[in-house]
Curated annotation (Swiss-Prot):
Disulfide bonds: none annotated. Its main location: membrane. This is Uncharacterized protein MG147 homolog. The chain crosses the membrane at residues 21-41, 66-86, 163-183, 197-217, 236-256, 292-312, 339-359.
Amino acid sequence: MLWTRALILELKTNKQSRLLWLLAIPLLISLTLLTYGLVLFSSSGRIDHGDHFHLRERFVLTTEELVTFVVASVVFALTVALFGLGCWKLLQGPKVDRTNIKLANSNPAPQAVVLQADCDHFQVGDHCVFSAEKQHFKQQFKQDFLGKSKFSFRNELYRFCLIGVLISLNLALSMVEIPGIVLPWGSSIQFRFFNTAILFIAIRFVGLLSTSLIAIITPWIHLLLHPVHTPISTVFYMGNDLVVLWIFYFFYYHIFKAEVKQTTTVVNNKEFSQLVNTHKTKVAKALALIPVNLICGFIEGLGFYVGYFLILGKFGSVGHKIFYDSQANRDLINSANVIYFLLTTTTIFSLKYLFELLFFYSVEKGILNISRHFGLY
């Protein structure tokens, strides 16, 4: 009973315990998968997957249902285990004076390094804004890749919790596939619209290395839950996510330097940190949209083109896979059809990345504020 009261007190008063609420996301996903599996198991019907029909019998355990139950059980068990481990860490942590809860929960961020010489360039009324000191490419890349500056050794548990949450979000959004995008010659393709945005967000949460691991792991979990895909298409999705992630990182953070700027505002001899999008930063964000959208859209379209050849194993049957009528001169061996195919898919996927980047721009400040609030950045 005393242990329970102590745990409740820690959860209420310890500021770092708020991060444990993020585990509610994988918990909700696992319960949703279990419910989905139970509904499949207890009902019968005909499911239209677009390219084939799935006949389901009541109370007959299929491979899809078995995989769903196993994955959901593993996610649920890991979530409960991480929550228990987090509670144990809270109880084992150093005790503080609970008579001053506000002081006990304070987690001030370290003061930013400022360049006072830049004060004249950021004069806003009575406020003097100092820009943060710039880092060299090698120093910033090492910091972003390993994420060392975002987590101390004591907070490694929080990194694993966040990785689990981001994998769950990426997996859930990868299930939202947009089918029936009609191509000019009458066939259609389907693509995933939202999951790449999670990778853009994850860079400033867990670092580039951990985000790359998320991009590698998620497509294979998706294959387990939705086995209508082939391993070759899974390799394509994995490779595409990795390439897009690194292209976005180098173009956005290094070539155009479009990241929101961290500044320190001095008011009445007191320093206040804030995030500012200067005019130069806004222009850089707009310019970064063009190459990232076009390059990533072309790479994903080219991946679809190569993937069909790999899946079918021979060039002559490509038309039967992509074009339903199998008419003469309608396959992807014809150079004109190849150009039309790549132009169409590049346009579609460029629009996809445009919306994802605009979404990332809209939440970028919130991402960094959350990271600072939990001491992650």
